[in-house]
Amino acid sequence: MMIQSVTKAGKKLFVILILGTTLLQSGCNNSTKETQQKAEKTDGVEEQKKTKSGDWEEARTTPYGKYPETVTYTLAQMNGANNSNLPKGQTYENNEYTRYLKKMLNIQNENTYMESEDRYDEFVNVIVKDRMLPDVMVISDKKMLDEMVENDLIEDLTEVYEFCTTDRIKAMYSSYGTELLDSVKYDGKLMAMPETVIDHGPCLLWLRKDWMDKLGLEEPQTLEEAFDVIEAFQKNRMGAAPGEEPIGLVCDTSLVGTTSSSYSVDPIFQKFGANPQRWQKGENGEVVYGSLTEETKNALEYLNQLYERGILDENFALRAQNNLRDLVVSGKCGAFFGLWWTPNNPLMDEYEEDPDSDWEPYYFPAEIQKTAETYSTFRDNKYVVVRKGYEHPEIVMKILSVLFDYTRYEAKDADEMNTYFALNVDPTARPLVINVDYNEATYRVTEHIQKVIAGDMEEEKLSAIEKSYYQACRNYIEGQNVTVEDWAAYKSRISAVGLLVKSDYRTPEKIYLQTSNLEIPQTLGTLEKNTFIQIIMGKRPISYFDEFVSKWYEQGGDQLVKAIREDSR
């Protein structure tokens, strides 16, 4: 009985032990699963962190790497007239440029400062003085860049340029030689990204071809023949309403043009080998101011003769830039000097009002005298700078790489943005108001378009910007649903630039003065401007030019020339 009792008790104990073991194993298994799940979850989080960290690292060190989270940067925006010609409803923070950058890089500009083009530089002076800089901004003065570097206000961009700029962007900068990037290096450090000032070529003479046809005039082959055409416009009162005096060749009182202005008389100065308002190499190899030379004196005498003949607008001294533009757009003027892009501004507006107006460009290279070597400077270039301490200085390089390389040469999804070229949307619509391109980009684009039109090149080989212009030019040639933008694209790219390509024009080699101290003091600038206008209008004899030169040196010019010669040695 005892044994039987023990056996029963043993069986119970055995069952209890088995059950306990089973429960223990079950508990251990559950614990192991929970531990594994926790470990897997931890590993997943760590993996996500590593992935996210890797994404940030890729974004910081590559041109096209996309940020895992939106990076917002504050910006000082230079806004253009008429909302930069942006399509209705688009803004400087929400347009095709900003949306594409958001999609491609996951970045967004926040325009904390906005100012018009004509007041932007003055505004920049204020915020720099007050040390109220946005993360990114464009400045338009080399002296301002010098000041910002001296006061340690901006970031060193050397490393981010190396890693976050594409090879093509670097090649674009290289097409200008080493001087351009060297101009923004301080103690070997790259402190800004300069605009590449593309060669816009010489000024062309734009004439109303429909007026010439109406008067039975032949197209001019020389500058003097062109002035005969303008004289005929005057005698036949072309563009003048009853009681109004006809308008001759309109020109701005500054007389000398820039890469962004029309209405100069540069070709007339070039006819005499003169380089007013430019520093040039003198006969003895020293730097001289071009406005003081005998060649400039001869050109002024010729301008006076044109004024006396009524060819030059008799009221040119009273007109402002806006007034000159109004004369062209209103159809009162039939002649002025302007660069190849003139159809975009102001001629496009006149064509929209009067589609029968027919402007043609003329170029007379045979009449350009061999001039002395002139010096270029970087004083008026635009520069992109980054605020000292901003954590994403690479963002500037990435924007340049996307806008001026990827979307123009590789992207298959940037059509809407690239239509901006044909729509003549102003560059101020871009977050960074500079352009980066090859030195001879203007001529390369036209040569490629002409090859496709002639059937010597496939359209697929065109870059995005070239394709946009080609399609507009093709629309104009075919005459189907032609828009004013199509007309402007054809007149600028084919008629104007095509004229330069045909004449085998080549970008002249530039010699740079490595100094930013070239600004003419206001007193000397005013003396020069008043003297030149008075001589042209006949209020002073041409002999007064020699007296002007003496006064220029006496009133501070002598010290200025000495200083510049010292800097250039």
Give the ranges of each region predicted by the language model.
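Helix-loop-helix "hinge/cap" segment bordering the ligand-binding cleft or interdomain interface
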Residues: 158, 185-260, 281-327, 332, ...
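Conserved small-residue motifs centered on glycine
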Residues: 58, 398, 405-530, 539
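Sec-dependent N-terminal signal peptides of Gram-positive bacterial secreted proteins and lipoproteins
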Residues: 7-31
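Extracytoplasmic/periplasmic substrate-binding proteins
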Residues: 254-278, 304-464
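Conserved N-terminal structural module of periplasmic/extracytoplasmic solute-binding proteins
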Residues: 3, 28-226, 287-289, 411, ...
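Short, solvent-exposed loop/beta-turn-alpha elements that line the ligand-binding surface or hinge
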Residues: 65, 156-175, 218, 276-294, ...
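Carboxylate/His-rich catalytic cores and anion/metal-binding grooves
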Residues: 142-179, 229-234, 244-278, 334-348
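Long, His/Glu/Asp-enriched segments that create or flank divalent metal/ion-associated functional microenvironments
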Residues: 99-102, 339, 474, 480
